C-alpha cells in the first residue's frame, strides 16, 4: 500500500445529467423530460435508480471508498457527511460470511429499514467494513451480498491480516469522510453487542473532548516469530506493552479522529498488531483513556455492552454458534437497557 498522502471520496449515488441545447426542439424535449422526472420523484419518493439508492434524504447504506492518489482534493466534490451520534464499523473479511449471517440473525438488523430504525432509536449507524481481494470469485460473492443487504462500506485496500493496521487507519478516514459523528467505534465481527447500551455510553457527558474508550490492558511484548502476535518492532517497545484497548471493540471521539485524518499516512508508525498500533498513536495525543470492562465481559450481565470469550479468544470462540446461543438467552437479548433498582 502506498504511503503517499491519500484522501477518500464516495461514488455518487445516482447519475448526473449533462445536456447542451443544440436546437429548440431538443431543449424543449429535455426540459419536458426533466419536468416529468422531477414530478415522478415527488409522487414516487421510493423510486430507485440502478438498484442502488433511494431518492430520499437518507444516505446510501453501502458506499465504496477509494484511495485518491492523484490529487489533494475530493474528486467529485465534498461529500455531505451524515450526522449521527456514533458510527460503528464492524471489521469483517472474505471468510466471514457466516459471522455476518450470525450478526444479522441476532443483534444487528438485517435490512436497510431495520438499520434506519436502529439509527433513529440509538443514534448509531452500523456498517460492515471490508477491503478487496484479487480472488474474483470472492469479489462476486461479496457483490451479491452487498446487493442483498446494502450494509457495507468497501475500502480500496487489500484484505489481509498483515495489513490490519492499514485497514484500521483507512476505516477511520473513510468513516470520518462519510459520517459527522461524535464517536467512531471499531468493532470485530465476532462479538455480541448491545447497541442500546453502547449508545448510552457514548452519550455520556465528558469533560475531555479527546477520548479513547475501551477495555484497557497491558502485557508482554511477543518476540517469538512463531507466535501469532509477534512484534518485529519489539526493540522499540521494551518488554511490556503500554496501556491500550483490546482489539475487539474500542472507540475514538471525533476530535481524536479529526487529528488522525489530518496527518499524512506515512506519518504513522505501524506496528504488527492493530490494537497496539492504535494505542501507540493515542500515546502521542492528549487523549483521556477511559477503561471500561463492560466492553469485554465474558457473559451477559445487566451492564454488559460487548460480550466475548475473554481471555480464551480475541472475540467469541466459534462465533457463528455462540452468537446464536447468546441471543437466545434473556439476559443477553431481552434484558432492559438499564438495570432495575434491585439489581
Swiss-Prot record:
Q: What's one GO-annotated cellular component?
A: Golgi apparatus
Pathway terms, separated by semicolons: Protein modification; protein glycosylation
* Transmembrane parts of this sequence: 22-42
Membrane topology recorded in Swiss-Prot or TrEMBL: Single-pass type II membrane protein
- Which cysteines are cross-linked by disulfides? none
Q: Where in the cell is it found?
A: Golgi apparatus membrane
Q: Which UniProt keywords apply?
A: Glycoprotein, Glycosyltransferase, Golgi apparatus, Manganese, Membrane, Signal-anchor, Transferase, Transmembrane, Transmembrane helix
From the UniProt record, list the coiled-coil ranges: none
Q: Which domain of life is it from?
A: Eukaryota
Which top EC class is named for this enzyme in its record? transferase
Could you tell me which InterPro entries the record lists for this protein? Glyco_trans_31
- Look up the EC number in the record and give it: 2.4.1.-
Q: Which molecular-function annotations from GO does this UniProt entry contain?
A: hexosyltransferase activity
Q: What does this protein do?
A: Beta-1,3-galactosyltransferase that transfers galactose from UDP-galactose to substrates with a terminal glycosyl residue.
User: What name does the UniProt record give this protein?
Assistant: Probable beta-1,3-galactosyltransferase 13
Q: Which organism is it from?
A: Arabidopsis thaliana (Mouse-ear cress)
Amino acid at each position: 500500500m502506498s504511503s503517499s498522502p491519500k484522501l477518500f471520496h464516495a461514488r455518487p449515488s445516482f447519475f448526473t445529467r449533462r445536456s447542451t441545447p443544440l436546437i429548440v426542439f431538443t431543449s424543449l424535449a429535455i426540459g419536458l423530460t426533466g419536468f416529468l422526472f422531477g414530478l415522478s420523484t415527488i409522487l414516487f419518493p421510493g423510486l430507485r435508480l440502478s438498484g442502488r439508492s433511494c431518492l430520499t434524504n437518507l444516505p446510501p447504506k453501502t458506499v465504496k471508498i477509494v484511495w485518491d492518489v492523484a490529487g489533494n482534493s475530493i474528486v467529485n466534490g465534498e461529500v455531505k457527511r451524515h450526522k449521527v451520534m456514533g458510527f460503528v464499523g464492524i471489521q469483517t473479511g472474505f471468510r466471514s460470511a457466516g459471522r455476518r449471517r450470525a450478526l444479522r440473525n441476532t443483534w444487528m438488523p438485517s435490512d436497510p429499514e431495520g438499520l434506519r430504525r436502529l439509527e433513529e432509536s440509538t443514534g448509531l449507524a452500523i456498517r460492515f467494513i471490508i477491503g478487496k481481494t484479487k480472488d474474483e470469485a470472492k469479489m462476486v460473492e461479496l457483490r451479491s451480498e452487498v446487493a442483498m443487504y446494502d450494509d457495507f462500506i468497501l475500502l480500496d485496500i487489500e484484505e489481509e491480516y498483515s495489513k490490519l493496521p492499514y485497514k484500521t487507519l483507512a476505516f477511520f478516514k473513510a468513516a470520518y469522510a462519510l459520517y459527522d459523528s461524535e464517536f467512531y467505534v471499531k468493532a470485530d465481527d465476532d462479538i455480541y453487542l448491545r447497541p442500546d447500551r453502547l449508545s448510552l455510553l457514548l452519550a455520556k457527558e465528558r469533560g475531555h473532548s479527546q477520548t479513547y474508550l475501551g477495555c484497557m490492558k497491558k502485557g508482554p511484548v511477543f518476540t517469538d516469530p512463531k507466535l501469532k502476535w509477534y512484534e518485529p518492532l519489539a526493540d522499540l517497545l521494551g518488554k511490556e506493552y503500554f496501556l491500550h484497548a483490546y482489539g475487539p471493540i474500542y472507540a475514538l471521539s471525533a476530535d481524536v479522529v479529526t487529528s488522525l485524518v489530518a496527518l499524512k499516512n506515512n506519518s504513522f508508525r505501524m506496528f504488527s498488531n492493530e490494537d497496539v498500533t492504535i494505542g501507540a498513536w493515542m500515546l502521542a495525543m492528549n487523549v483521556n483513556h477511559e477503561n471500561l470492562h463492560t466492553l469485554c465481559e465474558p457473559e451477559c450481565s445487566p451492564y454488559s455492552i460487548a460480550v466475548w470469550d475473554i481471555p480464551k479468544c480475541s472475540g467469541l470462540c466459534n462465533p457463528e454458534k455462540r452468537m446464536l446461543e447468546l441471543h437466545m438467552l434473556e439476559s443477553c437479548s431481552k434484558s432492559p437497557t438499564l438495570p432495575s433498582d434491585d439489581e
